Structures are given as structure tokens and as C-alpha cells.
């Protein structure tokens, strides 16, 4: 085989390999979780390319069964529904260590997106998450300061937004010193990864 023929063969082999790799990347699908609640099912697609640490953290809790039997403990009808940290009797579940805030990933707090709940410390998110039921632009990343860091979006509802809207309409009140708690328990029966 001449040197020119060898280079020609090598060049087209590399092109074929790259085309195959690109085709494989198109077929790669994001993880999807099923959130079974006492009011119906919600499916959410997660974005590991945009929020790798957040998705890894969330799926760790999913695979451990952490969310099973927890509740949506904070519901504000024109804002969001929050869950993933309390039992039906309002006991806070022990969690893993907090994760780094990935709110600077370009994803926005829009209706139907999932984001991590946290304290005033930008890097304090553990297990609790919320589903936006409004265009919450004020929660988006602006700069790396405690007041402007934002809340990390890591997924979006792809099925069951009707259920989310039912949850947002439940009556709320005070329970165990906390406000905006549903008066009718909204249980997260089980969360499983289905893709």
C-alpha cells in the first residue's frame, strides 16, 4: 500500500468514526423520572449536560428511595410547589452533604422547570426541589454573589403539568411553625428513573 493510499484510507476511516460518534450522540437521551404523587403522576426530563452535579445528586436520592413517602410541604399557587425533604408528619429527613450551585448553567426558572431549593447560602441545596408554576425570572442567575446567584434549574416537566397545577391549587396554612403547607397532604409516593 502506498503512503498516499494509506493516508486516504486513514482519513476516510476517521470520517466514518466521527460520523458514527455524532449519530450516537443524537441518540443519547436525557434521564427521565416518574414522580408518583397522591394527586397523580408527573414525568420530568433531567439535564445532566447543563447541571451535572445537580442531576447526579437528584438521581442519587431517587435511587436510594429517599423521596418515597415524602410530601410537597410548601405550595404557593402563583410561584412554585416544593417537596423532597419532609415526611407527612413534617419531620425533616437527614440528607447528604450540600452541593455546589449550578444556577449559572443558562437554564431559566420558567413554568414547568425543576430547580433546587436552598437556604440563603447559594451552595446549600441537598434533596429539596421545586417545580416552577410561574415565570420566576427573579430566581435566575445574575452573578456569583449570595443575593444574585439564583436557583439551579436541572430539568422540566414533560408530562403531568395538569397534576402540578392541581397541587398548586390546594389550600395551605401553618403547620409545625411553617407557612404555605398544604392542609391536605400531597404525598410523593415514589420517584423512579424510567429512562
Could you say what each language-model-derived stretch is?
Residues 17-195:
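Cyclophilin-like peptidyl-prolyl cis-trans isomerases
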Residues 5-16:
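Bacterial N-terminal signal peptides
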Residues 1-2:
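N-terminal secretory signal peptides that target proteins for export/translocation
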Amino acid at each position: 500500500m502506498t503512503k498516499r493510499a494509506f493516508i486516504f484510507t486513514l482519513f476516510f476511516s476517521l470520517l466514518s468514526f466521527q460520523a458514527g460518534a455524532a449519530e450516537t450522540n443524537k441518540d443519547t437521551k436525557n434521564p427521565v423520572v416518574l414522580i408518583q404523587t397522591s394527586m397523580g403522576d408527573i414525568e420530568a426530563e433531567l439535564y445532566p449536560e447543563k447541571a451535572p452535579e445537580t442531576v447526579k445528586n437528584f438521581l442519587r436520592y431517587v435511587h436510594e428511595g429517599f423521596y418515597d413517602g415524602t410530601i410537597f410541604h410548601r405550595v404557593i399557587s402563583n410561584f412554585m410547589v416544593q417537596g423532597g425533604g419532609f415526611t407527612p408528619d413534617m419531620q425533616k429527613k437527614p440528607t447528604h452533604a450540600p452541593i455546589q450551585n449550578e444556577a449559572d448553567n443558562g437554564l431559566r426558572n420558567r413554568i414547568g422547570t425543576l430547580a433546587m431549593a436552598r437556604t440563603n447560602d447559594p451552595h446549600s441545596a441537598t434533596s429539596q426541589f421545586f417545580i416552577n408554576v410561574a415565570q420566576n425570572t427573579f430566581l435566575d442567575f445574575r452573578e456569583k454573589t449570595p443575593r444574585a446567584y439564583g436557583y439551579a434549574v436541572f430539568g422540566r416537566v414533560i408530562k403531568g403539568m395538569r397534576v402540578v397545577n392541581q397541587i398548586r391549587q390546594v389550600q395551605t396554612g401553618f403547620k409545625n411553625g411553617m407557612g404555605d403547607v398544604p392542609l391536605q397532604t400531597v404525598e410523593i409516593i415514589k420517584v423512579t428513573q424510567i429512562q
